[in-house]
Amino acid sequence: MPTIQQLIRTERSRLKAKTKSPALKSCPERRGVCTRVYTSTPKKPNSALRKVARVRLTSGFEVTAYIGGVGHNLQEHSVVLIRGGRVKDLPGVRYHIIRGTLDTAGVKDRRQSRSKYGAKAPKE
């Protein structure tokens, strides 16, 4: 516990907030190249084969990013755009791949929440 004199001499230092997505380097999105596309199993109590990709970013980081939606066209050397946002049941996955940009196709036959999956409006 500091004395009042010590506090006058040097004020208390504020705690710096730690970023949840350091690989983005304060940018909303980052471009990267897929180095590996694979499936991963979630933590208990969930069970599935979640689609993820290892991505080397322009910021120099290599991160694991989640591929949302039903089906995807990604393979090694695909150029993708990633955003922040973790997947709660996949440890170490703190980024999402943005569908419908660069080499990532949008989700086919998607009718609801289309903007989140890069799907065009259905033909009427």
Curated annotation (Swiss-Prot):
GO terms for molecular function: rRNA binding; structural constituent of ribosome; tRNA binding. NCBIfam families: rpsL_bact (TIGR00981). With S4 and S5 plays an important role in translational accuracy. Interacts with and stabilizes bases of the 16S rRNA that are involved in tRNA selection in the A site and with the mRNA backbone. Located at the interface of the 30S and 50S subunits, it traverses the body of the 30S subunit contacting proteins on the other side and probably holding the rRNA structure together. The combined cluster of proteins S8, S12 and S17 appears to hold together the shoulder and platform of the 30S subunit. Keywords: Methylation, Ribonucleoprotein, Ribosomal protein, RNA-binding, rRNA-binding, tRNA-binding. Residues 104-124 are annotated as: Disordered. One of its GO terms (biological process) is translation. Pfam families: Ribosom_S12_S23 (PF00164). PANTHER family: 30S RIBOSOMAL PROTEIN S12 FAMILY MEMBER. Belongs to the universal ribosomal protein uS12 family. This is Small ribosomal subunit protein uS12. The modification 3-methylthioaspartic acid is found at residue 89. Part of the 30S ribosomal subunit. Contacts proteins S8 and S17. May interact with IF1 in the 30S initiation complex. GO terms for cellular component: small ribosomal subunit.
